[in-house]
Curated annotation (Swiss-Prot):
It comes from Caenorhabditis elegans. It is a multi-pass membrane protein. The chain crosses the membrane at residues 10-30, 54-74, 99-119, 158-178, 207-227, 242-262. GO terms for cellular component: membrane. Pfam families: 7TM_GPCR_Srd. This is Serpentine receptor class delta-34. Gene3D superfamilies: Rhodopsin 7-helix transmembrane proteins. The keyword Membrane applies. Keywords: Membrane, Transmembrane, Transmembrane helix. It is found in: Membrane.
Length: 298
């Protein structure tokens, strides 16, 4: 009886250990090494510069999501620009929809294809075997780059530079689109009522936040990351956690900004719940002045 209880307790403890290890893996980007001679950990940060197949891990999937979401913001601004340039437009054209979707997800699809065609699980075992000859008890990937040479590999170079495009290009695109939108709105001021003008200011503020938050969160943090990872600094693994959070922040707050500050999104959001629970619909706001119909874009 005692033996069965001990086995049950041992099984529960093992399950708890595995559960907490999964939590650690997901939230700290760390995983244990399957090596009886060592209890060290592999940090995905330096692993990315060593051999992708040895660390095809959560950062890679996170990067794919970020590649898509980072271009989604300027794609949204492009849609807003098309609305501003044609205030009587009721529906966006199919070609514009295709362009928005393509510009949002093309880069992440390319990087994803690179990951798929270059991923070979057996190579991770070969890397572990080769590096164990030189560092039998110390599994810090900073020591492995010279052995594998993957940092200079074409696929590594291509994926790294494509990911850098997703860091630096979208904020620049967003700034260009928001400036074009502001210029167009200024040219339409004579059509605005007082209420519409107030909505335009709120709309402009929302677009500014959408543009500045990614630029402030992403570019300085990522540049600091690129600089710091060239040095052997003990806090770098913790700094990478900050990097992940800062990279995800624009995406996390983008939907909130849109719903709170842009009227049609508010109406659509409220209408969704009214349709769901009350069966009522909210009609779109239309501004009419000087015999010109302008569907509210704010």
């Amino acid at each position: 009886m005692d033996v069965s209880n001990e086995n049950a307790n041992s099984s529960i403890m093992t399950m708890e250990a595995n559960f907490f290890m999964c939590i650690i893996v997901v939230f700290t980007q760390v995983r244990p090494v399957n090596n009886p001679e060592s209890s060290a950990y592999l940090f995905s940060g330096f692993c990315r510069h060593t051999h992708k197949n040895a660390c095809f891990f959560s950062f890679d999937f996170f990067q794919l999501v970020f590649d898509a979401s980072s271009f989604a913001i300027p794609a949204t601004l492009f849609y807003k620009y098309t609305k501003v340039t044609n205030i009587n437009m009721k529906n966006i054209t199919k070609n514009q929809i295709r362009m928005i979707l393509l510009s949002s997800y093309l880069l992440s699809l390319i990087v994803g294809v690179i990951y798929v065609i270059t991923y070979e699980p057996d190579e991770s075992l070969e890397v572990a075997s080769e590096t164990r000859k030189f560092h039998s008890t110390q599994y810090d990937f900073r020591y492995y780059a010279d052995i594998t040479g993957y940092q200079k590999h074409f696929w590594s170079w291509l994926a790294t530079n494509l990911n850098m495009i997703s860091i630096f290009v979208p904020p620049i695109m967003s700034i260009v689109f928001i400036r074009l939108i502001q210029i167009k709105l200024n040219s339409l001021k004579h059509l605005f009522t007082d209420k519409t003008a107030a909505q335009a200011k709120k709309f402009d503020l929302a677009l500014t936040i959408q543009t500045l938050v990614p630029a402030v969160c992403v570019i300085p943090i990522y540049i600091a990351h690129l600089i710091l990872e060239n040095y052997d600094l003990p806090f770098l693994s913790n700094f990478e956690k900050v990097l992940y959070m800062m990279l995800s922040l624009p995406t996390a707050i983008d939907a909130f900004i849109v719903i709170v500050t842009i009227t049609p999104y508010q109406k659509a959001f409220i209408a969704f719940f009214k349709d769901t629970f009350c069966g009522k619909k909210v009609s779109p706001a239309i501004v009419r002045r000087n015999n010109i119909s302008a569907v509210s874009i704010f």
